[in-house]
Design a protein with these regions (language model features):
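Residue(s) in the substrate-gating loop at a strand-loop-helix junction
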Residues: 165
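Terminal amphipathic helices with adjacent charged low-complexity linkers/tails
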Residues: 61-62, 263-269, 273-355, 619
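General structural signal for secondary-structure boundaries
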Residues: 6, 87-92, 207, 229, ...
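Thiamine diphosphate
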Residues: 1-159, 315-546, 550-555, 632, ...
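Walker B beta-strand of ABC/ABC-like P-loop ATPase nucleotide-binding domains
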Residues: 162
């Protein structure tokens, strides 16, 4: 049992939350009113009595984290932020969904509204990312305070989330939940709002299984509570709900927890309660008036604030301030006792790289041999291990492809309870830095997003480039949130070979380059790979990056040995040049740079002056000023060729009217990887032919 006793002021605050939610959607003319109305008592109970937070300092290190996975119900959270004193105002509620300047968008957006921990909306991602938050808490605590019992550590906190049937129906929640149980994430509690309604009607049509039994099978602690009484009446008993939550917290310290709350959507709105129409549309003037009458409000008054109830709810800020002061004492004692760890914490919080980062890369590059064949995935693995030696905050793994992606950190313990140990991975402990996601690419993307949002550490996750499609929605969300997640995608072309076209990416470079604020990086060789990592970690903007890497060996180029350090960070740079103005520019990325270099030599032998431009990252190149772009790709040189083992779509902005792509505009082939490249025209000979054709067209147009 909890010490919490519901008062009349609590009841009045919950009623006010319902009315404000209805008014906000009505004024906006669109939105999702039903869930915020029926979730009001749940959210109020969490914010007032369970979530440890300080509205005076939304970014307080010691706070619990709350994620509203069903982001369409955003007013559920906005109203509680208003009640708690986060700086969300009544005017903000009135401006719900109100355009680019609003602080209360239709779905919560990270970095826009104080108290919002992540952007949610695509269902299931908040649920899965909440698991990432729990990963991040545990690893960071192990990094900074491993010896202290977790409840006594200033770095221990809990993760709270609310989800609905839509989240549960999305496959991502199931695959992530399975992994969460395996990890024994006892600081994660998810409230499952089971109102049995979605846009197309009663969920019995599509969700027939016993969800709690499914989660029990995963290894979760489960319980349930119902506002619907046995006699059919409805009672929002928040004392009873609080007791169930408190019981779960005590009973399952080492299990993630799912608490199913049976509710009626939009209760007590006349004509809209338990009706699908209340899910995603405004209620209408008559229904809103009926809701207000049912709750004792004037149906003619909009956005009425019960000042006494609001003042009561705002007392949570006083409790938060007191909790913050207690935490400060604990944190200060930790800092005094652990000066080295405190220095590490300060560096991580500031986002600074460690001493020795550049030297680790320089020393590695000194081992590269010009002319030697090295797959860029192999170079990537060498880089990760080199910088991991000086970056304790770097951790990650793969979706069951670590040996292929080269994402294994040599000698690192596995992040998993000791009982998860296997013959292949005998060293498991809760603070390990080697991650294993199983065959769960989407979960991997969501978890690493959550790690970034919930800690000061730097995760990475790897898979085959072909399977990045499974991860795409999480990648897009990272780009939208502008967080520096690191995706490592190997086996990047038809050179994958005998696995055939199901495993040979063709359209993927174009499709990921189409995502705004995602930096796609495809290095040509070992030197470019090392420099790509250097710049990704050194740059101060906070965008996600995708390292797209070869399966096959590619030669370490003499030209990159001399120029990559200054060139890669520019996104595109002159790798091979000529005397005077070139006759043609050959642009290439990744494994095809070697063919552009070879073609330039052939053309030179025929008296054609060809400049080779390596383009490891179009996004980084687009960040450069006009003067630099003109120096690399002078407008006067209209004969151009692009060379990339994928569709040519992204290259046309550089090719101009007379340029010729050497590309792959079909699915791959079953067969040897090198032969596939030849059969599909990715050769130096084809580059030479394309260069001559482009030059001829330019001449003909004169």
């Amino acid at each position: 049992m909890t010490e919490f006793k519901e008062t009349e002021l609590d009841e009045r605050a919950i009623k006010m939350a319902k009315v404000l939610s209805a008014d906000a959607v009505e004024k906006a003319g669109s939105g999702h009113p039903g869930s915020p109305i029926s979730l009001a008592p749940v959210a109020y109970t969490l914010y007032q009595h369970f979530i440890k937070h300080d509205p005076n300092d939304p970014n307080w290190e010691g706070r619990d984290r709350f994620i509203l996975s069903g982001g369409h119900a955003s007013l559920t959270q906005y109203v509680q932020l208003y009640f708690s004193g986060y700086g969300v105002t009544l005017d903000d509620l009135k401006n719900f969904r109100g355009g680019a300047a609003t602080r209360t968008p239709g779905h919560p957006e990270y970095g826009l509204t104080p108290g919002i921990e992540m952007t949610t909306g695509p269902l299931g991602q908040g649920f899965a990312s909440a698991i990432g938050f729990a990963y991040g808490e545990r690893f960071q605590r192990g990094l900074l305070d491993p010896e202290t019992p977790k409840e006594d550590s200033p770095f221990y906190h809990k993760i709270w989330a609310i989800c609905g049937e839509g989240d549960i129906e999305e496959g991502i929640s199931g695959e992530a939940a399975s992994l969460a149980a395996n990890q024994k994430l006892g600081n994660l509690t998810v409230i499952f709002d089971a109102n049995r309604i979605q846009i197309e009607g009663d969920t019995n049509l599509v969700l027939a299984e016993d969800v709690l039994k499914r989660f029990q099978a995963y290894g979760w602690y489960t319980d349930e509570f119902s506002f619907i009484q046995p006699d059919g009446s409805y009672k929002e008993d928040i004392e009873g709900l609080a007791d169930v939550i408190a019981k779960a917290e005590k009973a399952a310290p080492d299990q993630p927890k799912l608490i199913k709350v049976h509710s009626l959507i939009a209760w007590p709105t006349p004509g809209k309660t338990n009706d699908p129409s209340s899910h995603g549309s405004k209620l209408g003037t008559e229904a809103v008036a009926g809701l207000k009458e049912a709750l004792g409000y004037d149906p003619e008054e909009n956005f009425h604030v019960d000042e006494e109830a609001l003042a009561h709810a705002r007392k949570v800020a006083e409790r938060g301030l007191e909790a913050h002061k207690e935490w400060d004492e604990k944190f200060d004692a930790w800092r005094k006792a652990n000066p080295d760890k405190a220095a590490l914490y300060d560096r991580l919080k500031a986002g600074e790289l460690p001493e020795g980062f550049d030297k680790a890369l320089d020393d590695l590059e000194a081992t590269f041999e010009v002319g030697k064949g090295v797959a860029t995935r192999g170079a990537s693995g060498s880089v990760l291990n080199a910088i991991a030696a000086v970056m304790p905050e770097l951790w990650g793994g793969s979706a069951d492809l670590g040996g292929s992606n080269k994402t294994d950190l040599k000698g690192a313990a596995t992040f998993a309870p000791a009982e998860c140990a296997t013959k292949q991975w005998p060293n498991c402990n809760e603070f390990g830095r080697q991650l294993h996601f199983g065959v769960r690419e989407f979960t991997m993307g969501c978890i690493t997003n959550g790690i970034l949002l919930g800690s000061h550490t730097r995760p990475f996750g790897g898979t085959f480039f072909m399977f990045s499609d499974y991860e795409r929605s999480a990648v897009r969300l990272a780009a939208l949130m502008e967080i520096p997640n690191l995706y490592i995608w190997s086996h990047d072309s038809v050179a994958v070979g005998e696995d055939g076209p199901t495993h040979q990416p063709v359209e993927h470079l174009a499709s990921f380059r189409a995502i705004p604020q995602l930096e796609v990086i495809r290095p040509a060789d070992a030197f470019e790979t090392a420099e790509a990592y250097r710049y990704f970690f050194e740059k101060k903007n906070t965008l996600p990056g995708a390292m797209v890497l070869t399966r096959q060996s590619v030669p370490v180029l003499a030209e990159t040995a001399a120029k990559a350090k200054d060139g890669v960070k520019k996104g595109a740079y002159v790798l091979v040049d000529t005397e005077g103005t070139p006759d043609v520019i050959l642009m290439a990325s990744g494994s095809e740079v070697q063919w552009a270099v070879a073609a330039a030599k052939t053309l030179a032998g025929e008296g054609v002056k060809a400049r080779v431009v390596s383009v490891p990252s179009m996004e980084w190149f687009e960040e450069q000023d006009a003067e630099y772009k003109e120096a690399v790709l002078p407008a006067a040189v209209k004969a151009r060729v692009s060379v990339e083992a994928g569709v040519a779509m992204p290259w046309y902005k550089y090719l101009g009217s007379y340029g010729k792509p050497v590309s792959i505009e079909q699915f791959g082939l079953q067969g040897d990887g090198a032969q596939n490249m030849i059969d599909l025209g990715i050769t130096a000979e084809h580059v030479v032919e394309a260069a001559k054709a482009s030059i001829a067209e330019v001449e003909a147009a004169k």
